[in-house]
Each structure stands twice: as C-alpha cells, then as structure tokens.
A protein has these predicted regions:
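Membrane-embedded transmembrane alpha-helical bundles that form the catalytic cores
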Residues: 1-370
C-alpha cells in the first residue's frame, strides 16, 4: 500500500477517525495502531507479517532478559549479541545471501574452480532494513542502559510496526518513539494541520517533482548512446532531484501522517543540496540512517578519537555498510566507496590535523535533531 495510492487514501481517514474515537484509552489506541499497521504491511504480502512479528517478539524478549540479568554483565552481553546476530541473520538471508552467493560463484569461476551456484531467490520483505535497524537500536540502547526496557508488549509492537515510517523511514530510536506510545495522546487541530501540510508537501515532492523528473531521466539514460553530453549532464541533474523528491517526499508524508496520530518523528532531510561540502551534505541527507551508523558503528569502532588513520578506516566502513544497506548490489557498494573517498579527501585536506578527525563526526551527527 503506497502513500500515493487510492488504497492509502481510503485507509488513512478510516484509521484516523477510529484511532481518535479511542482517545481516552491509550492501550486501545496502541492495539489499534498495531492492527492497522499489520493490515498496511500485509497488503504487500501476508508472509511479511510473520517476519516482522518474529523480530518484534525477539527484540522485546531481549529487553526483558536484559533487565532480569541487570547485574550480570556477561549474561547481558550474550543476550544483546544473540539478538543482534538473530536480526542481522534474518536481514542477511532475505536481502544479501544471493548477492554474496553470486559474487562468490563468480570469483571461484574466475579462478577456474567449479562450484554449485546456490541462490535462495527469496522475496525481499518491504521495509526490512528499516524495522531491523529500529529493533537493533532498542536492544543496544537497553544494553547500554540508555533506555529502560518496556514491559508493555503492545506499545513495543507499535514502536516497531508504526505504519507511517515502517517501509521508508525515518529510522526512529526507541528513546524518542517508544515513550510516545506509553503516554496518553491528545488530538489538537494544530498538530492535524501540521500533519496535513507535511503530507501535501511530501506528495508534491513525490508526484510533481520526482515523478516528472523520472520521465526525463528514464528517457535520457535509456538512450544514453544516442544523446549528447549536455543532455546526459542534465539527466544527472534531474536524477538528483528525482531521488531527493522521492525519498524526502516519502519521509515528509511519514512525518505528517504520524503527526495526525499525535506522534512526532525525527526530521530526515534538511535541504541537503544547499550544503557547502560533503561533510555538511551527510549531516543533512537521510539523517536517521547516518546518525544510526555513527552511534552504533562509527563511535564503537573508535570514531575519530585515535588519529586520522583510524578515522579514515571507520569512515570507509560506515560508508560501505551504508551502501550495502541501500541495496544488495555492486552499484551501491561503489556508491558507498565513492562517498567515503570524498569525505576522506576532505579529512586529509584539513589544514589542522588536530581537528581533521572531527570532519567525519560532523558528516554523521550523533544528534537525532533536524
């Protein structure tokens, strides 16, 4: 069920009216949000529901066990690691297994080694990268004692499957989103009008900007051999606006839809094409993903605290992972490597090496603010 579909146009007002008819009962609202979100998600494929339910139950249980063994650090470490491995294994099997299997088969064939070509050919569940990272952030934050684990399983289900941001982000943190499901929410005309403005602005970006740019982009690159260099250059410019309108448009619709239900989501894009350099660009582009990689990968690896060589290594790692996160394809890996190279050059060109290592952190802010 896409945001710009007739089905969603019917779905949203019905869910909105029924949700606010329960305004005196927070638990009932949460249960209804879960039911509506599962209907929304199951619209693509009912099989997806089993997978997201498994992720949710295991992540909820990990929080409960982490609280139960609060004074036993080794046990807590095992629980946290087990949940991370489980969630990443599910993500790997569905999204990355065939990519790495194809790569291994091609590599062995290059050296004349005959090997079976094993592929799973599994349907990729919509939004699995988003809700997996959201589930991981909960477990890690509870393990780090940045968050008290919840015993309210319905609220936790709502946190993982909240339909406005389920399939296209923003990737929310439990520290921001989960507490909003644990307290009463009041309807106000101000938040409803804010939500509608964001939805309309997002639809404009998606349907007017992105979709119209896509017509020119598709026709240009479909016949790239027969068009001149100037046209190809304009095709690249239009493609930049297409992906921005597409991605940020969906984020705006998600943020606006959440506001209709009294929920505030983080800002995901902040005029990225007005950035002065690559570091600032990555402060403004897909903020929720970039802050996730900083908090859970970059900083644990040492961040920029141990000199330029360590910083360069960590920047390369998070950008390669970011490329893989966007898609199981060599194109995305190269895209990640290209952006890593640009930021590494920026670090090396910094005149004051004492502060050069701050560039990477600036490019991927820790704050979840917009």
């Amino acid at each position: 069920m896409l945001f710009n579909s007739v089905e969603f146009l019917i779905f949203l007002p019905i869910v909105f009216l029924l949700y606010w008819s329960m305004f005196r009962h927070t638990k009932a609202q949460n249960a209804f949000i879960v039911a509506a979100s599962y209907l929304f998600y199951g619209w693509w494929d009912l099989r997806f529901l089993l997978l997201i339910a498994l992720t949710t139950v295991c992540s909820y249980a990990s929080g409960v066990f982490l609280a139960q063994y609060n004074d036993k650090e080794n046990t807590r470490r095992i629980i946290c690691t087990a949940n991370i491995v489980l969630n990443l294994s599910i993500l790997f099997v569905y999204k990355y297994f065939d990519f790495f299997a194809d790569g291994l088969h091609a590599l062995l064939s290059t050296f004349g080694i005959d090997s079976p070509h094993i592929r799973l050919n599994m349907v990729l569940p919509v939004g699995i990268s988003f809700y997996t990272f959201q589930a991981l952030s909960y477990t890690i934050d509870v393990y780090r004692r940045h968050l008290t684990p919840t015993r309210d399983i319905i609220a936790f289900f709502a946190y993982i499957c909240f339909f406005p941001q389920l399939v296209a982000g923003p990737i929310e943190r439990a520290t921001n989103l989960l507490p909003q499901f644990l307290k009463p929410r009041q309807f106000t005309y101000q938040q409803a009008s804010e939500g509608m403005r964001m939805i309309l602005w997002g639809l404009f970006k998606k349907m007017v900007v992105a979709d119209n740019c896509a017509v020119f982009v598709d026709s240009t690159f479909a016949n790239y051999q027969s068009v001149d260099g100037g046209t190809l250059m304009w095709g690249g410019v239009f493609f930049a606006f297409q992906i921005y309108g597409d991605f940020s448009g969906y984020s705006d619709i998600a943020i606006g839809t959440a506001r209709l239900f009294g929920i505030r989501l983080m800002r995901n894009f902040h005029y990225p094409y007005l950035s002065r350099d690559m570091a600032e660009f990555w402060r403004r582009w897909h903020i929720s993903l970039n802050t996730w990689f900083v908090d859970y990968v970059y900083i644990p690896l040492g961040g920029s605290r141990h000199g330029i060589s360590t910083t360069i290594r960590n920047v390369a790692i998070i950008f390669l992972l970011s490329g893989l996160w966007h898609g199981a394809n060599c194109t995305f890996v190269l895209w990640g490597a290209y952006n890593a190279l640009l930021l590494i050059i920026l670090i090396l060109l910094d005149k004051n090496h004492k502060h050069a290592t701050d560039v990477a952190a600036k490019g991927h802010p820790v704050s979840s603010g917009g």
